[in-house]
Amino acid sequence: MLNSAMSVVILAAGKGTRMYSDLPKVLHKLAGKPMVQHVIDAAMTTGAQHVHLVYGHGGDLLKHELTDPALNWVLQAEQLGTGHAMQQAAPHFADDEDILMLYGDVPLISSQTLVHLREAKPQGGIGLLTVKLDDPAGYGRIVREKGAVVGIVEHKDASEAQRQINEINTGILIANGKDLKRWLSQLNNNNAQGEFYITDIIAMASAEGQRVEAVHPERLSEVEGVNNRLQLSALERIYQREQADKLLLAGVMLLDPARFDLRGELTHGRDVVMDVNVVVEGNVKLGNRVKIGAGCVIKNCIIGDDSEISPYSVLEDSVLEAQCTIGPFARLRPGSELAEGAHVGNFVELKKARLGKGSKAGHLSYLGDADIGSGVNIGAGTITCNYDGANKHKTVIGDDVFVGSDTQLVAPVNVASGATIGAGTTVTRDVAENELVISRVKQRHISGWQRPVKKK
């Protein structure tokens, strides 16, 4: 039965020694964000009023990474078991709220399963998430009498008969705050590990005549924990395949779903096609009929209808209107904006640059801190020299400007509409409308020139 309020406790104090890392285990990333952030997000989605994060190892790193002001930080100075961790959080529990216990290293738990668990919790009893395994070795076993859950016995404390049980405890449970505080106060560490087990409260509830309702998750991967990098990589692939399947069913054509990574949120139009080894990060919005070539990385971008990103291009924090073409091997850095029909070709880099309607930068150019009008042609090898060693400066180019190859525009500088800049020119002063600017050294011809001979 639901209480009107619910708080969540996330256990995240483990050292993660098997990760062989200076980073706390729960900060290792899955799909681009820390494992524990996945758990926090699931908790928030269930409508939790408070999230208590129990931490120990690497507290400063955790607080630096997890900046949500809604988190209540609870220190577990010594790691003496799950029951001990919950005892540290217990002073924050209200009597009339549900307390949901989660783990920072179980990143794929879904909000749907948590809602189901909460709805199944009996009045005065416990909702418990369990699964059945073909090989339950190492896990706490669910002990039943006449079908009812009466206790959990850890593997090291289990008898041979109990070790034959294949229903295991996932560690995720929910109980009323008042009841939970009472049970936590009665825990002891009389077991093989010398730890305080949260699982002992199951027997306490049963002894009081309270019902324990076992619920199963939709997928086994939801309750799989991470103790080493091999397990983390396995969950990463499970997660990515799930995201790929959702996109395929929603109409996105992934040419090889096994070679696609989504590390954020993707919204899309119809008939989107993505080739192999595409990585999508942050918040990305793709319009209708967008094509993404092999090996591209797209982060926090909006890409308009009928645009095409050719292979091995990297786009970050950029906005592209309809019918833009990018790459191959192009880079759009944060602040890049392309109007309809703009083209950025191979080995061209943009940073805080706006390219107007139909403008083109086809080859080997750097355009930084630039505002470029419509119908502009940027020749190969053009550079906006935006940095003077101390400060950045802006280049402004009007409409219908032709910039010849190997041009340097030394900012701050303005090139008015209709101007033409000859190849090899270094522009240091403003250019007026329809002017031709050329600063090359006059070409000389020397007949009969003898090359130097190499000395032996």
Swiss-Prot record:
GO terms for biological process: cell morphogenesis; cell wall organization; lipid A biosynthetic process; peptidoglycan biosynthetic process; regulation of cell shape; UDP-N-acetylglucosamine biosynthetic process. InterPro entries: Bifunctional_GlmU, GlmU-like, GlmU_C_LbH, Hexapep, Hexapep_transf_CS, MobA-like_NTP_Trfase, Nucleotide-diphossugar_trans, Trimer_LpxA-like_sf. It holds the Pfam family Hexapep. The keyword Secreted does not apply. Residues 251-456 are annotated as: N-acetyltransferase. Binds 1 Mg(2+) ion per subunit. Gene3D superfamilies: Hexapeptide repeat proteins (2.160.10.10), Spore Coat Polysaccharide Biosynthesis Protein SpsA, Chain A (3.90.550.10). UDP-N-acetyl-alpha-D-glucosamine binds at residues 11-14, 25, 76, 81-82, 103-105, 140, 154, 169, 227, 333, 351, 366, 377. Catalyzes the last two sequential reactions in the de novo biosynthetic pathway for UDP-N-acetylglucosamine (UDP-GlcNAc). The C-terminal domain catalyzes the transfer of acetyl group from acetyl coenzyme A to glucosamine-1-phosphate (GlcN-1-P) to produce N-acetylglucosamine-1-phosphate (GlcNAc-1-P), which is converted into UDP-GlcNAc by the transfer of uridine 5-monophosphate (from uridine 5-triphosphate), a reaction catalyzed by the N-terminal domain. In the N-terminal section; belongs to the N-acetylglucosamine-1-phosphate uridyltransferase family. This is Bifunctional protein GlmU. The gene is glmU.
